[in-house]
């Protein structure tokens, strides 16, 4: 059963400080839009973040794509833009190893993701230890709230994240109520009758294109929000093919918000 509660109502009752903060930002900005910004230079990345910042609740990064990445040159300015425009940061790392390994990958190395990314995500393929390892890394790295999304479903053609795999990933999410805040999924993942209020973030959302020739399949905004998505993840629809990111940012923000208001009625 898809929830009809408002983001404000969900913020008030949610056990996760990070989810509370995200719901609050969404309500303040009247936005359930996450911008997925996959570009190869820091300058282009920061420019797009600054332009799209007013329209989004969340920016999604693949930080290892950036050729000239540096903590001081890329992350410090990104954090300043997050403060300026009031959005959160989601590093789409898709962790998929045993607990001890992901703990080090999350906290250490070149990217030090746990230091700056409010949200990250993980596959369920290695079992519940992945949640424990990532949570320990977050707690040992920062006093700021952090949240984890489990990858329950993907938007790519032929994805193996279906059926029993999806069900077991949901079971892994149930092992931690305050750190696991939700799923990357195409629909509502249930759990309401057991006291869970999971955020559903959905990639592969487009107002124009139906696919990209490389397996991505796009679905409409109204369809995914009506089906239980709380946050729509949009990438090339915002800035690809010569699009104006400010125009598209407002277009997708408005479409996403109106779809949410319809769901709440």
Swiss-Prot record:
Q: Which UniProt keywords apply?
A: Decarboxylase, Lyase, Pyrimidine biosynthesis
> What top-level branch of life does the organism fall under?
Eukaryota
* UniProt-annotated catalytic positions: 94 (proton donor)
What pathway does the annotation place this protein in? Pyrimidine metabolism; UMP biosynthesis via de novo pathway; UMP from orotate: step 2/2
Supply the EC number(s): 4.1.1.23
Give the top-level enzyme category.
lyase
Q: Any one Gene Ontology biological process term?
A: 'de novo' UMP biosynthetic process
Which parts of the sequence bind substrate?
38, 60-62, 92-101, 218, 236
Q: Which reaction does it catalyse?
A: orotidine 5'-phosphate + H(+) = UMP + CO2
Q: Name one Pfam family in it.
A: OMPdecase
Checking InterPro entries in the record gives: Aldolase_TIM, OMPdecase, OMPdecase_AS, OMPdeCOase_dom, RibuloseP-bd_barrel
Any GO MF annotation of the entry: orotidine-5'-phosphate decarboxylase activity
**GO CC term, one of those recorded:** cytosol
Concerning NCBIfam families, the annotation shows:
pyrF
What family, per the record?
Belongs to the OMP decarboxylase family.
Name recorded for this polypeptide: Orotidine 5'-phosphate decarboxylase
- Organism of origin: Cyberlindnera fabianii (Yeast)
